[in-house]
Amino acid sequence: MPIRVYSTLTRQKEEFQTVEPGKVSMYLCGPTVYKPAHIGHMVGPVIFDTIKRYLAYSGYQVTWVVNITDVDDKLIVKANELGTTVEALARKMTEDYLDNLRTLGVDGIDHMPYATQYIQEMQEIIAGLIEKGYAYPLNGDVYFECTKDADYGKLSGRNLTEMLAGTRAETRDGKHNPADFALWKGSKPGEPAWDSPWGPGRPGWHIECSAMARKLLGDTIDIHGGGLDLMFPHHENELAQSESCTGKPFARYWLHNGLLRKSSGGKIGGDHSRHGDSADMMAEKHAQEEQKLAGSKGAESVKTAVFTKFDPEIVRFFLMATHYRSPVDFGDDRLAETEKSIDGFYRLIESFGRATGKDFYSLPVPATRSESEKSWTATASANASYEAELAALRTRFLDAMDDDFNTGAATAALFDLRKTLNSFITEEKLEGDGRSNATAQAALVRGVMLFKELANILGVLRKPLEKKSAGGADDEFVNSLMQLLISLRAEARKAKQFEIADKVRKGLTELKVTLEDRPEGTIWRREA
């Protein structure tokens, strides 16, 4: 089936067709870098990194741009508070942002432009808008005149006439209409400033993205993404000024991800088919913003609030378990549920290693869908039922991703694929007598390669899971204690003191530690 995407602009799913066949241009609004990145800053990049992965897997050549806003009122205020320069603060916070993206496996960004590097391009657009009558200078500032754009409000569904109802035609600051927004801001003493035809100043927020997207991706881009909270006014204003400048559609598809909100519980790894597809997108936006995770918890550095307690792999799995347009219930309880849910994936990887002697993480897998299709043509097999189940789960996963990048449903398919592989290992006794069964071994490798291929699309299972120690306990010390207990239990069993051995196992179980006896020895793991 063809890829279909839900565009906020049309409020419906559409067949994905790009401006240039075989190529995708994608722009995601990045952060204003005035403080350390929090978990909310990570949602969009992880989602759109996954979208790029799937589009590339589907055969597209994708160019993905994520901007950095390195000049803004917030940056100026924060730099003054800290007694540093805007440039130094922006550099430091940008590196923090990039470090967090790398930690989460977001490695597909092709261009990360800084707003201050595109001042000339911004001024060219502003001059063009003035010339066409869409903008006007005012006391060193330049404003976009919203009433001159007959389509203003089409993205958010807001009616400009209703927005202006009850307001005076001219506002006290001289703007023609209250809705008019700044394209250029005259500078104040001590603020960053660039020369312009309208006097020294700096760009408005919205013009930055229009200029960078146009310069790097062209007049019309395929996908414009961002959080639902950016739909209005930021994306609405981007669209208005860009289309007024070029006379062309700014973006073919507008994709908005849901916002983080305080955890309210729920199942991890389900379909999560309910998501933000309301015809009234502004109502959806306001509903999510009312529950948006903010304040001390939401704004806390992601390194402090999350990565000290949970492996980043868990965070990425967690975000994949929900459709990107859905609001995301976030909290330590949800991450703990995710950790517990995905533990089985890593146990499967361990079982695979014991059964085949192969390293899961170095398995070669197809990079594209067309390459993968070649290995899934119908063939006679001694394990026909198993092979058919693998093929069906592969189709289910890909159908989910074709349906507006539904990672929630795709993740559910991955869980079921894990069950199928575990059952095959058990039925064929591949960790025991069945190790000599070359046909079954090959079938398992084939299935696990599919498992890895699909996991790669989601950007998960990149490395072994790192368990975070509760209360900062020393992992090496804890492991040494566990090995001592395992040794004492083994001696008790050897001496036929089974009551003592069982007491050790039971006590550890109560502490949420599981012992697993294997031919090569006993291993332990801490349950989430």
Segments the model singles out, each with a brief description of its role:
Residues 79-86, 110-116, 199, 227-228:
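The substrate-binding groove and active-site-proximal loops of carbohydrate-active enzymes
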Residues 1-34, 49, 63, 99, ...:
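Alpha-helical recognition segments enriched in aromatics with Gly/Pro capping
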Residues 10-15, 19-107, 517, 521-524:
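N-terminal, positively charged nucleic-acid-binding surface of large information/translation enzymes
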Residues 266-268, 275-285, 289-528:
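Structural preference for alpha-helix termini/caps and helix-kink/transition segments
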Residues 68-72, 93-97, 107-122, 140-149:
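Short, glycine/charge-rich beta-strand/loop segments that flank catalytic centers
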